Design a protein with these regions (language model features):
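Short acidic (Asp/Glu) and glycine-rich catalytic loops that position anionic groups and cofactors
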Residues: 1-4, 46-51, 222, 268-272, ...
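N-terminal intrinsically disordered, cationic/polar leader segments
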Residues: 1-10, 15-17, 25-29, 35-42, ...
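Catalytic-core signal marking the mid-to-C-terminal active-site face
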Residues: 3, 10-23, 31, 36-43, ...
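Short beta-alpha connecting loops at secondary-structure transitions
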Residues: 6-9, 273-280, 308-315, 342-354
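Generic secondary-structure signature for well-ordered alpha-helical cores
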Residues: 22-33, 49-52, 70, 74, ...
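A glycine-rich phosphate-binding loop feature that marks nucleotide/adenosyl-phosphate handling sites
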Residues: 40-46, 262-270, 307-315, 344-348, ...
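Helix-rich catalytic cores of soluble enzyme domains
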Residues: 107-336
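Metal-ion/cofactor- or nucleotide/acyl-coenzyme-handling active-site neighborhoods
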Residues: 314-328, 332, 345-373
Length: 476
């Protein structure tokens, strides 16, 4: 017999979420969203239940919204059904230098390769961790995918990937590489709160409609800036924007499936008015996650929380406290996928050593919540009776057989006493994490097949010479 799972209860109930859903449907039908793209407007205009008004405002009847929700598809990989998932990275431009502890630097190609290898060694998913700023801008996203395909089993290869494809030409190179490498390809559209889109982003999506690629919708309203000041009001706007955006995709992208991105599902960002900064890891952002999880269940969206985000600038006590509390409370609510591991300063910095510590924190929580058996065998009544008063269990057969599985043996959070720690060099947690990160990178072995690698090289060499690709990144 198993012990009952530990859980946190409370928060949004079904009646309250029904009300938010009704509000979102009303907003879709009576307020609408701005879609600044004539080609997409023309497609939408052909549907009954779509109303196009001046200024490219589009409104959707509730039945179209409900159909979009019904037809949404979430191709969660098999490993995500059994494992705790860590998504590591969101294309940062600054990182900590593993060879010079504490030194911040601009990310380069070598950092991209090393962090991809590190993430693969830790079984992480998600997008490329850093942007190689030593590479021309029009090649950066192509190289980020190429390196991920070549050196990682899961990175840029499942529903947890969320990288931009900044131009149609760039998207097509990545699409071609994904086919060669046998990797997943999808295109994402970001809504710009409140209720609008970037015209260029829509143009890329429009040109991809005949390619049969999955498309996802995401939005990130900011409380008090691009959405109401209350977090619950911001979440209400987020639900509206997600439902409207998904409906648009479901009507225009009929050659493949569409979905709400689990990476930012029902997002609502907290914003500090004193410093004008995003405050991931804050009390308010954790509050957002407590709204997000039940809404994901309500709409059947896979749960992925940003519990690994912190506003701390270094791998320090603040970072550990924010991430530890956020991870534990969301895990108690049922989350088993955690995003943004390795990020510091609310996403401004990437840190390989912090990724290693993030993994340890998640493993810590996982071991707290692992299923526990309640049985006569585990109560050990006979053992208690067999050991006389003042005796010891240390030499008992049961102790020898079970101590390794009864205790978690952490990689970083070691249980040494003071003397043992001093004999081991008195290293800080930061240094332990750096050493482990470098060791994992050195020992990493996965590489894509040679034949596929050669094809990827050819595609990348062609991209280097493509003037049209380069011009697509120019700002006139």
């Amino acid at each position: 017999m198993k012990l009952e799972d530990y859980k946190v209860t409370g928060g949004l109930n079904k009646e309250q979420m029904d009300k938010m859903h009704e509000n979102a449907l009303w907003l879709c039908e009576n307020v609408g969203i701005n879609i600044p793209h004539q080609g997409i407007i023309n497609i939408l205009s052909s549907y009954n239940g779509v109303k196009v008004e001046s200024g490219n405002y589009v409104k959707f009847k509730p039945e179209l919204v409900m159909n979009a929700l019904k037809e949404a598809k979430y191709d969660v990989p098999e490993y995500a059904k059994d494992e705790w998932i860590i998504s590591a990275g969101a294309h940062q431009t600054a990182c900590y230098d593993l060879d010079n502890p504490g030194r911040l630097k601009e990310a380069e190609e070598k950092d991209l390769i090393n962090f991809i290898k590190l993430g693969d060694a830790l079984d992480t998913v998600g997008s490329a961790p850093v942007v190689p700023l030593d590479i021309p801008a029009h090649l950066q996203h192509i190289l980020m995918h190429k390196v991920a395909y070549e050196n990682s089993r899961r990175r840029c290869n499942d529903i947890y990937e969320h990288m931009d494809k900044p131009s149609y030409e760039c998207a097509m190179y990545i699409h071609e590489m994904a086919k060669v490498a046998g990797k997943r390809f999808a295109f994402g559209i970001w809504m710009i709160s409140p209720r609008s889109f970037d015209a260029k982003n829509l143009e890329i999506a429009y040109k991809l409609l005949d390619k049969g690629v999955p498309m996802w919708i995401a939005t990130m309203p900011v409380a008090g800036v691009s959405s109401p000041i209350t977090m619950i009001g911001t979440i209400q706007q987020s639900v509206f924007e997600y439902l409207a955006g998904l409906t648009m995709l479901n009507l225009i992208n009929r050659k493949s499936f569409n979905y709400i991105s689990p990476n930012d599902a029902f997002e609502g960002d907290a914003f500090d008015m004193k410093y004008s900064t995003f405050i991931y890891g804050s009390v308010e952002y954790t509050e957002h996650t407590l709204y997000q999880i039940p809404l994901c269940r309500y709409y059947n969206v896979p749960i992925m929380t940003k519990a690994a985000l912190t506003n701390s600038k270094q791998p320090d006590g603040q970072a550990a406290a924010e991430i530890g509390m956020h991870t534990l409370i969301t895990a108690l609510m049922g989350a088993r996928a955690f995003r943004c591991a390795g990020l510091l300063s609310s996403g401004e910095i990437y840190s390989g050593e912090w990724l290693v510590i993030n993994k340890e924190i998640v493993d810590y929580v996982k071991n707290i919540l692992k299923p526990q058996e309640f049985s006569e065998e585990r109560l050990f009544i006979d053992e208690i009776a067999a050991v006389k008063a003042g005796g010891s269990f240390i030499g008992r057969k049961s102790t020898m057989q079970l101590f390794r599985q009864e205790y978690w043996m952490p990689e970083l959070f070691t249980h040494m006493n003071l003397g043992q720690w001093q004999e081991a060099g008195s290293k800080s947690m930061w240094q332990y994490a750096i050493d482990r990160a470098k060791k994992l990178i050195t020992r990493h072995t996965y590489q894509i097949d040679d034949d596929k690698k050669k094809e990827l090289d050819k595609i990348y060499e062609a991209a280097k010479k493509d003037k049209k690709l380069e011009d697509s990144f120019r700002i006139y």
